[in-house]
């Protein structure tokens, strides 16, 4: 599994530090991300980081289950498991996967002069709509939930 992570998953990830100089990243509609609280190993400096999980990666990873059945791992779990390898100089204190659902209603006025242009604008707004739902696990860490919602 480590080999799959290093060769296929890790190169596709974007690691983002969140601080006053690096604001919270934009998460696309139905986008998933891993938020982490890390501590520098030799210092007490805290680092908050987000890994936006690319939609291009398959959500499930097939692993060898023998001849009789197939085994799969969830991509989010694999990334979370190897989080400490992504930041080797840090200790992983907390982590949480979340998913963003954005307002994707499309309103088109039939009497618009340029119907094609109206559709183009509506589709652009659809990708960047307001967040209407945040999906987290029930047992998620309250501190990390507060961090991503503020």
Give the predicted meaning of each segment.
Residues 1-150:
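N-terminal non-catalytic structural scaffold regions of very large proteins
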């Amino acid at each position: 599994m480590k080999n799959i992570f290093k060769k296929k998953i890790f190169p596709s990830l974007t690691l983002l530090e969140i601080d006053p100089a690096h604001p919270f990243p934009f998460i696309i509609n139905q986008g998933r991300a891993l938020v982490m609280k890390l501590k520098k190993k030799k210092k007490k400096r805290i680092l908050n980081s987000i890994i936006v999980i690319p939609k291009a990666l398959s959500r499930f990873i097939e692993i060898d289950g023998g001849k009789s059945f197939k085994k799969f791992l969830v991509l989010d779990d694999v990334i979370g498991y190897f989080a400490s390898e992504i930041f080797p100089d840090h200790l992983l204190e907390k982590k949480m996967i979340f998913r963003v659902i954005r307002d994707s209603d499309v309103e088109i006025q039939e009497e618009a002069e340029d119907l094609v242009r109206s559709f183009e604008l509506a589709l652009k707004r659809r990708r960047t709509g307001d967040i209407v739902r945040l999906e987290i696990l029930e047992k998620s860490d309250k501190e990390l939930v507060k961090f991503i919602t503020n």
